[in-house]
């Protein structure tokens, strides 16, 4: 595609902005039991940072590391896919799939990534490592255990940044749910707007960026499935009152390995329209995706939901509030839900009261360390990524 219309650009901007809003909305309630949040959640800060009121957390900080790399001039023409990478035949025997069984298609031979694409992955990995390295200065607070272990090992390693991260992630891969945290899913949404119109390239990008910290099939799958849903929501020609349905998320199953599609179809179907606190929002990537999806779909049909009020932006607000009520890892569940809600309703649907106070830390433009950015900065950044990366 050659251009985006105004509505698509608004939805592209909504991906990053609504993620940050969900993140900041969930921060104060992290660790609460499912369903324990009484009344509408508010951006009052605190949490595990602790964070200032209306400040986003590590979820959005890592997403902004990716966004900053996607905007870097070193990425030629936005061509971020690894076109020459074959499927599982060239992959190393590492990583785990469902139930802890080895998944030979997971950890790919990253040496096959073309140099023009490797430059982007290096840029993302370098920003992750810089983010991690400034923890003592107040950036990178509340880092997940798995992400911390991988980035710590990668920081001490040798070679190109992406190669160090991929290697460290593979070395720290664990079986079962413990090795499949939600630290990649929480940051994946922005990748959806990097190659709009090219689902295969976007899926490859989502897999490889996930693998920088999490070498697990469930993490790859969840990132691919969610990123694809976000991208299609940005590009779709929605009618004013049209809501997100089960088929929208299931449409991404064709991008997953055939042997894992049944697992994900069950996960989607059993969480559609369910009260999110019945799923919970703890750190396993599959549970997080299910909780976010439940919050989105349940809030559309709930008595206090958005039926008849879609054009007012209530769909986005109700969905994020429902995500926080899932409990557990509330900032991450709401951040993930925000990616897709923003892709459906757009940046223009974000309540002005949230937009006025939202802020947080992001990579310093043109250097190392961080700077503070606000809602308007995220919109500009997302629009730039979307326009730069249009697939030909």
Regions found by a protein language model. Give the residues of each.
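Structured, active/binding-site neighborhoods that engage oxygen-rich ligands
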Residues: 1-392
């Amino acid at each position: 595609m050659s251009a985006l219309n105004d509505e698509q650009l608004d939805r592209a901007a909504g991906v990053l902005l609504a993620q940050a809003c969900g993140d900041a909305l969930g921060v104060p309630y992290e660790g609460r039991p499912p369903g324990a949040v009484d009344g509408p959640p508010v951006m009052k800060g605190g949490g595990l940072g602790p964070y200032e009121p209306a400040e986003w957390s590590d979820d959005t900080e890592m997403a902004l590391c990716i966004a900053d790399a996607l905007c870097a001039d070193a990425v030629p023409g936005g061509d971020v896919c690894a076109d020459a990478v074959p499927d599982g035949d060239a992959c190393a025997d590492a990583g785990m799939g469902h139930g802890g069984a080895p998944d030979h298609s997971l950890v790919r031979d990253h040496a096959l990534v073309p140099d023009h694409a490797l430059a982007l992955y290096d840029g993302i990995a370098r920003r992750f490592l810089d983010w991690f390295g400034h923890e003592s200065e107040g950036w990178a607070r509340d880092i997940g255990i798995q992400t911390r272990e991988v980035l710590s090992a990668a920081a001490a390693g040798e070679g190109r940044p992406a190669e160090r991260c991929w290697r460290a992630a593979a070395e720290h891969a664990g079986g079962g749910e413990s090795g499949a945290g939600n630290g990649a899913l929480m940051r994946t949404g922005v990748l959806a707007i990097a190659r709009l119109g090219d689902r295969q390239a976007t899926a490859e990008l989502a897999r490889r960026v996930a693998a920088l910290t999490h070498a697990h099939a469930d993490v790859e799958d969840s990132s691919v499935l969610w990123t694809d849903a976000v991208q299609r929501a940005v590009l779709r020609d929605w009618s004013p009152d049209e809501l997100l349905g089960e088929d929208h998320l299931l449409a991404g199953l064709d991008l997953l390995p055939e042997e894992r599609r049944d697992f994900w179809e069950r996960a989607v179907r059993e969480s559609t329209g369910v009260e999110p606190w019945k799923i919970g929002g703890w750190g396993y990537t599959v549970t997080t995706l299910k909780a976010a999806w439940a919050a989105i779909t349940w809030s559309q049909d709930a008595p206090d939901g958005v039926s008849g009020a879609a054009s007012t932006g209530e769909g986005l607000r109700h969905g994020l509030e429902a995500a926080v009520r899932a409990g557990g890892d509330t900032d991450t569940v709401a951040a993930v839900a925000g990616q897709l809600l923003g892709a459906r309703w757009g940046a223009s649907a974000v309540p002005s009261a949230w937009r006025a106070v939202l802020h947080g830390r992001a990579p310093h433009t043109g250097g190392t360390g961080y700077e503070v950015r606000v809602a308007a900065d995220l919109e500009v950044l997302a629009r730039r990524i979307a326009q730069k990366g249009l697939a030909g």
